Amino acid sequence: MDKLNLYHELEQLLRMNSRYCMDDGRLLKNRIVEDALSIQPLLVKELLGNEKMKKAFFTDVEGVMVFDKIKFQRFVSDTQFLGGSYTMFKNKIGLANENGRFVSESREVVLSWPYKDCMLEGGQTKEDAKRNEVFWNETLAPDEVNRLTEPKVFSNFKRYDKEGEHQVEHLSDTENLIIKGNNLLALHSLKKKYAGQVKLIYIDPPYNTGSDEFGYNDSFNHSSWLTFMKNRLEAARMLLSDEGCIFVHIDHHELFYIGTLLDSIFGVENKVQVISVKTATPAGFKTVNPGPIDVTEYILFYTKHKNSFKFKKAYVPVGYNVNYNLVLDKNEDILKWTFTPIKDAMLQSLGFKTEKEAKDRYGDMWKTLKNQLIAQYAFNHADNVVSVRDPHKPTEKVKSLMKQSKEVGHVIAYEKEDGTVSYFYNGGALAFYSNKMQVIDGERCVTELLTDFWNHISWAGIAKEGGVKLKNGKKPEKLLKQIIEMTTNERDLVLDFHLGCGTTAAVAHKLKRRYIGVEQLDYGKNDSTIRLQNVINGDNTG
């Protein structure tokens, strides 16, 4: 059977399985390769049941059919599978070896460090308790590795509600869990029940700054941290649903290494963004820095399968945009629509004929007050306040309408196929201030779309949130609210296996999400369980 016919045969076979075919008919190539490399029984059974696939990708070894997953992976990765013009080079960009194979596929060039092929238990229970541990090699110490990865029995459960603490006789599937203990052991123990069910993972792991709580094997501190993170991220990925995502919060010390590690575990194709978060202002820094003052942390955002992930638009409050500087007076006849500068409209609304009258009335206050009054006027009259601007990537039709509007000197309306109407005036498109209005936290406000630079969340005064304190690294509840709302819906499952004082769980609880939190350090009176009890009792400090 020639290769092109085999491509077609395989494509038709895979399209019959909803796991590999989207609603629009496109095949999920990455998932097919992933299932092949992990020898997913469903895929192997499908292939084995087809005589042509059986002949192409299986070898009979004394009556046992052995699947050649590498041959299959190369076949599926070929540019001719699922279309594409012919080229001797592959249809993606990347570093390749002399044989033309990508280094990420051949694994001849990867991020390496001492003890990468080992497992680090990470048994530290107090922040200041330094600990030397053995790196268990997966080949040389399989029994110890199996001991760490085999499911453990959770014990000593207690249930908390508004009536207080209760003994647990039965756990339902909808329970929120706070697990006290080693997070590596906990992740592997959660697999049987929760594999493929978690919608969002957020973690704020030790930053490995040398002064934080990561206290393992100082001689190999960097390697210890990478091994520690790799072991846990690989286990966590198995818990994510196909529509799930992970946010890893970090600072600059390990940013580039954790990014490369996440690329290898979740796939470069599933990286969404690296978000920069402003966490402080220069005013509080008294030490002399060798460079710019460090006020930024980073959140790495990955999906399990980007094609399956459902992105939500998110908005953030902003101040008045001075480009919205005209007030539109609408008449029934669009040819008679007129425009007034917003400053003049604001003055008229206050009973002033000229700005000089306002200056005489308010004196030195006027310069500051004027801007505040214009912003307030725009907010109160958002349906009529507009900006004339150049659209982003206009179509030829839009370009023609803009040119026409400049020539005729009045507003032109254009109804699009979806029923919405666009307006053009003086060579530009009208943007209405009302389109920037959203309701956030119950208040109507001026907004813009969320970007990958987050400076809208205050980190001041968060020490008292939740009624607990954390010496280092406490995160604002509004930060977690932003992440949880943009990636999940009510009743979705959220996981944080570096729970700390419980911010993620507290916010998830308030937003009616289910959650699992894991923490092995003992924070005493500032423990996550204390915080969750406060939330149950109506805490509103976040």
Residue ranges, per PLM feature:
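Active-site-adjacent helix-turn-beta-strand microarchitecture at beta-sheet edges
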Residues: 84, 117-119, 305-466, 477
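Flexible, glycine/threonine-enriched loop-and-boundary segments that flank and lead into catalytic domains
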Residues: 184, 279-288, 420-442, 469-493
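DnaQ-like (DEDDh/DEDDy) 3′-5′ exonuclease domain used for proofreading
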Residues: 1-199, 210-223, 390-400, 410-419
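Signature of N6-adenine DNA methyltransferases within the class I
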Residues: 229-232, 242-243, 247, 252-319
